[in-house]
From Swiss-Prot:
Organism phylogeny: Eukaryota, Metazoa, Chordata, Craniata, Vertebrata
Binding site for a ubiquinone: 201
Note: Heme 1 (or BL or b562) is low-potential and absorbs at about 562 nm, and heme 2 (or BH or b566) is high-potential and absorbs at about 566 nm.
Keywords noted in UniProt: Electron transport, Heme, Iron, Membrane, Metal-binding, Mitochondrion, Mitochondrion inner membrane, Respiratory chain, Transmembrane, Transmembrane helix, Transport, Ubiquinone
Organism: Artibeus glaucus (Silver fruit-eating bat)
Family in the record: Belongs to the cytochrome b family.
Residues that hold heme b b566 according to the record: 97, 196
Protein's recorded name: Cytochrome b
GO biological process: mitochondrial electron transport, ubiquinol to cytochrome c
Primary localisation category: mitochondrion
Gene Ontology molecular function: metal ion binding; ubiquinol-cytochrome-c reductase activity
Cofactor stoichiometry and binding remark: Binds 2 heme b groups non-covalently.
PROSITE patterns with a match to the protein in the record: CYTB_CTER, CYTB_NTER
Length: 379
């Protein structure tokens, strides 16, 4: 008799996606981050749901409701810090996942890649709105500064900002709508994840070599299920360690001060995972130019498949491109550091240099290096 997992209308979808799915035999640990992101999303939705049961999205009570969660709700402190640090873990996995895609040429699956970029934007929007909800100083001023950037859009900018604010400043209406969207977006992200997986399973996975692996496939279960479970354990151990030993390591102390529109914090900055984009924004003296550079710093990923001129898909056998890739990683770390520094000499010039190099590497140096490698291989 045929196994029920192969005949049941619902189970056979699960079976073809997670059990009998043919997978390349050479996948390294860099392929673990997709499933880790799934776990992060699950943790965020669960902890967020329980936090929403106790949170109030009103400017008068939002800060106190978060304090109440931490002090009076059973394991409320654990929920709050799991949610806050879970977001950091989410972005660590996201950036590593995107980095893996760039290194091994996974972007040649253009549908999967483009849905991934859409997912990145959706998760960033969710995280930004979530950061506003505790209604601390950095929440309020971060929301004010970032939403105010939209006023740089010609003609409609000012009206657009006031429409998003629901008034003439960030206030109760802004907080309420941000809470509504912050609750809704993760479910949209979940739907996009399903589309992402649908497109991925149309083509099958890439592998470290970048060579088609059709002749050498193995079933996803038990090989990669066990491997993924090990990844879950490692990540959840790291997250638990962060939450239980140093929950405020990645947060901003200013967010423990209730929001006050009359006092501006000395350094307004977003969470660490947005600092690289924030540094690029600050590097350009013109407001509209800065906003365009900020958007392009992420949207540039969409043109990476067009810029792929190498005869080889993966960077595994391309040492020159590898050097350039790791230089790009170093630039991103530099930008993250600069984003957290005050706007003064020498940080300004370092930020501007790193921003120029970031775009230069992706737009010009990587394609040129690929051409040189093609020539060296006499193709």
């Amino acid at each position: 008799m045929t196994n029920i997992r192969k005949t049941h209308p619902l189970l056979k979808i699960v079976n073809s996606s997670f059990v009998d799915l043919p997978a390349p035999s050479s996948l390294s640990s860099w392929w673990n981050f997709g499933s880790l992101l799934g776990v992060c999303l699950g943790v965020q939705i669960l902890t967020g749901l329980f936090l929403a049961m106790h949170y109030t999205s009103d400017t008068a009570t939002a800060f106190n409701s978060v304090t109440h969660i931490c002090r009076d709700v059973n394991y409320g402190w654990l929920l709050r810090y799991l949610h806050a640090n879970g977001a950091s873990m989410f972005f660590i996995c996201l950036y590593l996942h995107v980095g893996r895609g760039l290194y091994y040429g996974s972007y040649t699956y253009s549908e999967t890649w483009n849905i991934g970029i859409l997912l990145l934007f959706a998760v960033m929007a969710t995280a930004f709105m979530g950061y506003v909800l505790p209604w601390g100083q950095m929440s309020f001023w971060g929301a004010t500064v970032i939403t105010n950037l939209l006023s740089a859009i010609p003609y409609i900018g000012t009206d657009l900002v006031q429409w998003i604010w629901g008034g003439f400043s960030v206030d109760k209406a802004t907080l309420t709508r941000f809470f509504a969207f912050h609750f809704l977006l993760p479910f949209i992200v979940t739907a996009l994840v399903m589309v992402h997986l649908l497109f991925l399973h149309e083509t099958g996975s890439n592998n470290p070599t970048g060579i088609p692996s059709d002749p050498d496939m193995i079933p996803f279960h038990p090989y990669y299920t066990i491997k993924d479970i090990l990844g879950f354990l490692v990540m959840l151990t790291a997250l638990s360690t962060l939450v239980l030993f140093s929950p405020d390591l990645l947060g901003d102390p200013d967010n423990y001060i209730p929001a006050n529109p009359l006092i501006t914090p000395p350094h307004i900055k977003p969470e660490w995972y947005f600092l690289f984009a924030y540094a690029i924004l600050r590097s350009i003296p013109n407001k509209l130019g800065g906003v365009l550079a900020l958007v392009m710093s992420i949207l540039i990923l969409a043109i990476v498949p067009i810029l792929h001129v190498s005869k080889q898909r993966s960077m595994m056998f391309r040492p020159l491109s590898q050097c350039l890739f790791w230089f790009l990683v170093a630039i991103l770390f530099t930008l993250t550091w600069i984003g957290g520094q005050p706007v003064e000499h020498p940080y300004i010039i370092i930020g501007q240099t790193a921003s120029v190099l970031y775009f230069l590497i992706i737009l010009f140096l990587m394609p040129m290096t690929s051409m040189v490698e093609n020539y060296l291989l006499k193709w």
